[in-house]
């Protein structure tokens, strides 16, 4: 089939959204590391271990499927367990889609006493992340700084199961870990800002451990929300103005508190799991760009027609968002997604995603 001719470049399309103007069509963007690598005949591990190959795989895959890489997602810069000395390995079998944690740096209360904020230039896999950021800068893309929320980074340091127990029995330990996580995130972000300048950086945060599948809204407000407030105070002090937030999983019960706190500059890019209705998301955040949220399981396991139909529904809802919409999956695009289902997404945007 022949697709309609774009009337804007990706840069023009995203610039329009961030200036509260309608673009020619709904942009497509994906949170993904493994899929582009598999798409060009490489392993998922390549996405985490070879910045040049990953970058080229993403560029070619984006062109193939009409994705808009303003901004481009990339592997995490800050990793809670790995950065603090935890064990890990690269994904090996076809069903492993990310780094695999083999041990946590904090196993007991006493381990927290010995925990030190890492050197931002040397810890974990930060060197590889810097290589990728320099490739983004070289090719005229925003430099995407990817971290999880302080709550999620802290949970990654000791493991979510242990962190959840401490929330109930020793909440002061969780507070200590979150303060350490916050300092580490911003030490590394300062390194990025010193290297590229605040105007070039697009700060991305995900918050998977804050899902209501894990914690209650009361726990969210007590433990996680204060660190979102502090995060944005520090982000503002660095002069970073572009923010992308993946509110991962089922966080329907957290949305009122997030909306009420009014934390980030507007418009920001707010991504939602498939569990959140896009029209409801737009009601909570009318001044931000809504991003999402075709169910990833259906993209991997469903038929092209099912994916096409779900994408159409997302487009119809997203078009109603007062400050704009970006079409994506509801979380990371599964590495084993059939290529034809990505074509189905592009076809649905071509058929229904234009602003006339």
Which residues does each predicted region cover?
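Membrane helical hairpin/interfacial module
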Residues: 58-59, 63-82
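A contiguous, low-structure linker/loop signature
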Residues: 78-118
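Conserved FAD-binding subdomain of flavin-dependent enzymes
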Residues: 54
């Amino acid at each position: 089939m022949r697709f309609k001719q774009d009337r804007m470049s990706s840069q023009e399309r995203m610039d329009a959204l961030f200036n509260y103007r309608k673009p020619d069509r709904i942009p497509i963007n994906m949170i993904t590391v493994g899929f582009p690598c598999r798409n060009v005949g490489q392993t998922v591990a390549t996405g985490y271990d070879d910045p040049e190959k990953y970058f080229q795989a993403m560029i070619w895959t984006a062109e193939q499927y009409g994705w808009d890489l303003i901004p481009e997602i990339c592997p995490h810069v800050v990793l809670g367990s790995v950065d603090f000395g935890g064990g890990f390995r690269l994904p090996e079998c076809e069903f492993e889609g990310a780094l695999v944690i083999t041990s946590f740096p904090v196993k007991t209360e006493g381990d927290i006493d010995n925990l030190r904020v890492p050197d931002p230039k040397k810890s974990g896999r930060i060197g590889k992340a810097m290589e990728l950021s320099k490739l983004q800068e070289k090719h005229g893309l925003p430099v995407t700084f990817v971290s999880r929320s302080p709550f999620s980074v802290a949970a990654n340091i000791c493991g979510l199961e242990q962190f959840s127990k401490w929330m109930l029995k020793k909440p002061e330990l969780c507070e200590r870990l979150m303060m350490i996580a916050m300092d580490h995130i911003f030490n590394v972000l300062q390194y990025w800002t010193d290297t590229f300048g605040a105007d070039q950086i697009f700060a991305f945060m995900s918050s998977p451990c804050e899902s209501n599948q894990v914690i209650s809204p009361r726990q969210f407000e007590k433990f996680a929300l204060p660190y979102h407030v502090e995060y944005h105070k520090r982000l503002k002090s660095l002069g970073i103005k572009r923010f992308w937030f993946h509110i991962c999983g089922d966080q329907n019960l957290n949305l009122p508190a997030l909306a009420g706190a009014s934390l980030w500059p507007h418009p920001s890019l707010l991504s939602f799991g498939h569990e959140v209705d896009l029209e409801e998301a737009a009601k909570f955040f009318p001044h931000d760009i809504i991003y999402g949220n075709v169910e990833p399981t259906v993209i991997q396991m469903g038929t092209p027609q099912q994916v096409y139909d779900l994408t159409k529904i997302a487009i119809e809802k997203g078009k109603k968002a007062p400050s704009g919409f970006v079409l994506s999956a509801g979380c990371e695009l599964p590495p084993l997604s059939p290529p034809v289902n990505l074509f189905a997404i592009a076809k649905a945007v071509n058929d229904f995603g234009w602003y006339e």
